[in-house]
């Protein structure tokens, strides 16, 4: 096993690993075993629909599919007004898939770093916590994140026109 890259994470250690056969996977090592169990349960329930597939795991780690793509945050920060619509649609698709699986619950953290875009589809990568709520709450949390995210270009382009 060879570590190819370390991903940014506040609480956990997240690594891109190359196995002896050359295939890539992500190893997420959790600071807390309960968080690991929560995430494993969510990933197994989502079964690859809008999240990485589980390849294996242990007491405090999960090995999962590597979804090659770009961070939703990076796409958001570089998008022009026209691209914002397709980004919003892809995030909405994730929220709908999640809501179908976890009726009455939404992801606790909708930081755009927790999503990857691949071929126009949005995948979530942080499932340690979920909270009771509706799709409307998900959308409101995402809108708040987008509006309050601190950027250099006047705190983000205005995408709504009066």
Locations of the language-model features?
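Conserved kinase catalytic-core helix
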Residues: 44-51, 73-118, 122-123
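Conserved short submotifs of the Hanks-type protein kinase catalytic core
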Residues: 59-71
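Catalytic activation segment of kinase domains across protein kinase-like and atypical kinase folds
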Residues: 113-141
């Amino acid at each position: 096993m060879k570590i190819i890259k370390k991903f940014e994470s506040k609480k956990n250690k997240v690594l891109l690993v190359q196995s002896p056969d050359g295939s890539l996977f992500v190893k997420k090592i959790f600071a807390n075993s309960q968080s690991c169990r929560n995430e494993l349960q969510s990933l197994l329930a989502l079964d690859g629909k809008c999240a990485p597939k589980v390849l294996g795991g242990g007491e405090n780690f999960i090995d999962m599919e590597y979804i090659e793509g770009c961070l939703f945050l990076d796409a958001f920060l570089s998008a022009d007004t026209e691209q914002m619509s397709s980004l919003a649609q892809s995030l909405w698709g994730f929220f709908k898939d999640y809501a179908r699986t976890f009726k009455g619950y939404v992801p606790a953290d909708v930081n755009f770093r927790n999503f990857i875009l691949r071929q126009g589809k949005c995948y979530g990568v942080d499932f340690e916590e979920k909270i009771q709520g509706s799709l409307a709450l998900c959308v409101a949390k995402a809108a708040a994140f987008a509006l309050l995210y601190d950027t250099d270009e006047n705190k983000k382009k205005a995408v709504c026109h009066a």
